[in-house]
Amino acid sequence: MKTVVQWEYDFRKWSENMIERSQVDVNQTWDLSHLFKTEEVFNEALEDLKGKVEAFQKEYEGQITTAHQVNVGLATYRALLEQRGKISAYCNLAVSANTRDKEAQTRAAQTRTVLAGLDAKLSFFESELSQLDDAVLEEARANKEDALYIERLLEDKKHLLSKDVEAT
């Protein structure tokens, strides 16, 4: 079994032998422009997501009472998660493509911080859905787009503790 010192030595040797990304044939690299054409477009998408999350939180937090609101909310939530995933992929793939790129590392770290904050703002949604009456969720389940999600939510709901029990 290798010691920590041996692993560190192996890693240093491996990293010394790595070629620079600029030396790699462009046909062997990821083209991240399919996600965002430019850094500016990426930054605009991140700002757009921040605004959409704020609006979503204002519109839905403490306001979901009907099956229609559940369905519209879930459609919006899916779109937010899709945009979030694209932003996250762009940052993480840029770092994976070139681990020596300090700019990409900084952008990824800053973006992860922003996304964590947005995730916290969105966390109310699934929690509030799980607190809805089963009849409302069953009605919302009629929407094919939401059926599987709501089916799982109803199943998970059986195992949730009440707010009073959670508080103790």
Feature locations, PLM:
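A well-structured
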Residues: V5-T168
